[in-house]
């Protein structure tokens, strides 16, 4: 069996949740895990806020684990705020790589700014790629300006001292709409991780069944490449699909069924959305980290009022396990 057909063993409960955390900064939204393992320690960076949904406000937190399944939130969270960004007001979709050659954590992320109408609805936003480095994953030196003008959810692989590849959502045109951004995944190349060249054509595009293709994550193994990404499908559901490639350039899309579906169960934390996949190759197993939406629409906002979000709320992070022997 190929990795894109892996049988994932998911937990009944999230590993982190805005509904159960004791930390005050992420009690409304909790979103987009990115995980690395260095030695015997697993580190997870993730996003959160305690104001309300649909706002360009999101900070960055850190959690650690010794087994990849049970996590402890860092006491100094959030470790980075919107005020630490050189552009915009919200952290979005980080991706962290530990560079073993330089003994350095490197993070690519999106910086978001938004504009609302008179009813408080987000009607326009700009999303630009940023970069930061850290010796320990806690204290970060943020690059002082955006490094690419259009993006969402970068995923970076380092092939050598001067060879980086990235897959990221990007708008085909400089003035493209948000729907264009989340409907196209491109491949990029760089010699330093800062200056990026985008391929002329996207490698994955939205279609009639998958109305978006967003949050790409790529794993390379002996058989080639597997890319996971999230998609809006019928029924108000968002699920993780896959494509595979032998060279990272030409992809075969496996859209007949999701690689990691929402359960559709109204009682499950991941009943409505499975999103922002992050797959860790961890010895004799793979770990799939993801954020999730349940079917609830109500939440308590930061001002104490009860608010309604018709699309649900990103408020859980889950993990699923697949032993390599089962693939």
What are these regions (language model features)?
Residues 1-327:
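Carbohydrate-active catalytic/glycan-binding domains of CAZyme proteins
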């Amino acid at each position: 069996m190929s990795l894109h057909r892996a049988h994932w063993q998911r937990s009944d409960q999230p590993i982190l949740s805005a509904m159960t955390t004791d930390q005050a900064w992420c009690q409304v939204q909790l979103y987009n895990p990115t995980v690395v393992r260095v030695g015997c320690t697993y580190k997870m960076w993730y996003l959160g806020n305690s104001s309300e949904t649909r706002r360009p406000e999101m900070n960055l937190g850190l959690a650690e684990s010794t087994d990849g399944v049970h996590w402890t939130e860092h006491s100094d969270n959030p470790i980075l705020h919107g005020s630490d960004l050189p552009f915009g007001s919200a952290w979005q979709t980080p991706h962290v790589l530990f560079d073993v050659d330089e003994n350095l954590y490197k993070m690519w992320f999106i910086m978001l700014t938004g504009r609302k109408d008179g009813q408080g609805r987000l009607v326009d936003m700009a999303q630009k790629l940023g970069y930061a480095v850290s010796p320990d994953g806690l204290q970060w030196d943020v690059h002082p300006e955006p490094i690419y003008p259009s993006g969402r959810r970068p995923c970076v692989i380092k092939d050598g001292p001067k060879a980086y590849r990235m897959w990221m959502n990007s708008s085909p045109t400089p003035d493209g709409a948000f729907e264009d951004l989340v409907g196209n995944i491109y491949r990029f190349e760089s010699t330093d991780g800062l200056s990026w060249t985008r391929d002329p054509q996207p490698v994955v595009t939205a279609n009639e069944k998958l109305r978006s293709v967003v949050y790409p994550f790529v794993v390379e193994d002996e058989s080639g490449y597997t890319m996971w990404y999230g998609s809006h499908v019928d029924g108000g559901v968002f699920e993780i699909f896959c494509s595979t490639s032998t060279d990272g350039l030409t992809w075969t899309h496996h859209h007949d069924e999701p690689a990691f579906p929402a359960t559709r169960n109204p009682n499950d934390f991941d009943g409505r959305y499975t999103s922002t996949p992050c797959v860790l190759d961890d010895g004799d197993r793979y770990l799939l980290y993801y954020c999730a939406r349940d079917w609830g629409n109500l939440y308590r906002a930061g001002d104490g009022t009860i608010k309604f979000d018709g699309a649900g709320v990103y408020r859980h992070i889950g993990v699923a396990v697949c032993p390599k022997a089962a693939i």
